């Protein structure tokens, strides 16, 4: 069973509180999503494998640690997931970036996939799927399905705000993946939005309605 972790660092919780506010501007919202993703990255990347490497300091030769293989991929679920990419890339700039495009049918609440663009060697990479919201879990499940169909097996899902229903759905569908979130909220409302949530992350990131 994959692990589920709420990353409750004080800085993350403080920034998340500002992010939720209706009064937060598009500019500030965008910056906060980026900052929170970067802060979460410290914990999300904790389990990366290390290997020994011989280096030379100004004083002597020594054996130190580096990330093994460096085969990482960040895969945002479009469009809102794009807002989290730069925060993680600032920590692992050599990571490749794939894209999975989906939209949610407003009547059925089911995700519809319209784009999959991934590195050719995605099956060899440690993958971090990012989306600010884990609501019903439908988009997350479909994204992981797409990755597994292409041979991927080492997958983590990273969200800013999650609903219990979405977490359970993703765990039931893919019990092997790890899930990280900055907040576990109360529930979904009748329209499938997280309560208290932060509204439509995509609209707030890009200033659309």
Curated annotation (Swiss-Prot):
Q: Which gene encodes it?
A: upp
Q: What disulfide bonds does the UniProt entry report for this chain?
A: none
**What activates or inhibits this protein?**
Allosterically activated by GTP.
> What protein name applies here?
Uracil phosphoribosyltransferase
Question: At which positions is uracil bound?
Answer: 194, 199-201
Q: What is the recorded function of this protein according to its Swiss-Prot or TrEMBL entry? A: Catalyzes the conversion of uracil and 5-phospho-alpha-D-ribose 1-diphosphate (PRPP) to UMP and diphosphate.
Is the keyword DNA-binding assigned to this protein?
Answer: no
Per the record, what are the reactions this protein catalyses?
Answer: UMP + diphosphate = 5-phospho-alpha-D-ribose 1-diphosphate + uracil
Claim: Iron is one of the keywords in the record: no
A GO BP term here is: uracil salvage
UniProt-listed SUPFAM superfamilies: PRTase-like (SSF53271)
Q: Tell me the protein family, please.
A: Belongs to the UPRTase family.
Q: Name one Pfam family in it.
A: UPRTase
* EC numbers, comma separated: 2.4.2.9
Cite the binding residues for 5-phospho-alpha-D-ribose 1-diphosphate.
Answer: 79, 104, 131-139, 200
Q: Which GO terms describe its molecular function?
A: GTP binding; magnesium ion binding; uracil phosphoribosyltransferase activity
What NCBIfam families has UniProt attached to this entry? PRK00129.1, upp
Tell me which species this is from.
Streptococcus suis (strain 05ZYH33)
Tell me the keywords, alphabetical order.
Answer: Allosteric enzyme, Glycosyltransferase, GTP-binding, Magnesium, Nucleotide-binding, Transferase
Pathway linked to the protein: Pyrimidine metabolism; UMP biosynthesis via salvage pathway; UMP from uracil: step 1/1
Q: Which residues form the signal peptide?
A: none
Per its UniProt record, the required cofactor names are: Mg(2+)
Cofactor binding, note field: Binds 1 Mg(2+) ion per subunit. The magnesium is bound as Mg-PRPP.
